[in-house]
């Protein structure tokens, strides 16, 4: 049980890393349309973010310190450092913007911010479970109401402007 949460998070990150590398390979310096019908711009930013994802996996600490709370309601990972959590949030937002641009506001910012704020202020050590919960809720919502993020007035489109990717 001790390594199960680590393995799940690592697999989740590896899937995102593969997506970043796929965008880089398919469309270096140009755009391509994903299987979901979303236009993506590929390039160095995808490679950079993919490597950052691999570094995230290498920097996960304290996974043998994971335990279940006394009331058996929460999985706690108290050794998960705030530095890792913030780095993961930044990396994951970059991933959603690069590879899931229609999800970047809701899935990226809102769902990353909720477990991070909870972890910092009132649910110490509960970040991983809160992150899993917010991700699961979003995935279920997105599957039931796919047009919310794709075509409604709440849809958020990426600029897909090559200039924004090549000039810092």
Map each language-model feature to its residues.
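Hydrophobic alpha-helical membrane segments
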Residues: 11, 132-150
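Non-cytosolic membrane-interface motifs at loop->transmembrane helix junctions
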Residues: 42, 157-163
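Generic multipass alpha-helical transmembrane bundles of integral membrane proteins
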Residues: 2-125
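A cytosolic-side transmembrane-helix exit/cap motif
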Residues: 23-31, 125-132, 151-159
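Conserved small/polar residues in nucleotide/adenosyl-binding loops
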Residues: 166-167
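Hydrophobic alpha-helical transmembrane segments in multi-pass integral membrane proteins
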Residues: 92-94, 143-159
């Amino acid at each position: 049980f001790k390594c199960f949460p680590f393995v799940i998070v690592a697999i989740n990150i590896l899937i995102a890393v593969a997506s970043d590398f796929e965008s880089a390979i398919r469309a270096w310096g140009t755009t391509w349309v994903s299987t979901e019908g979303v236009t993506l711009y590929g390039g160095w930013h995808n490679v950079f973010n993919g490597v950052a994802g691999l570094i995230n996996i290498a920097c996960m600490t304290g996974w043998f310190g994971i335990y279940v709370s006394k009331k058996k309601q929460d999985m706690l990972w108290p050794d998960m450092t705030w530095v890792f959590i913030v780095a993961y949030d930044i990396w994951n937002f970059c991933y959603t913007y690069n590879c899931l641009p229609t999800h970047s506001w809701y899935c990226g910012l809102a769902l990353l911010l909720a477990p991070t704020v909870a972890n910092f202020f009132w649910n110490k050590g509960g970040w991983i479970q809160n992150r899993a919960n917010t991700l699961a809720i979003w995935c279920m919502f997105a599957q039931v109401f796919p047009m919310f993020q794709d075509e409604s007035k709440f849809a958020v489109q990426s600029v897909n402007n090559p200039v924004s990717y090549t000039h810092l």
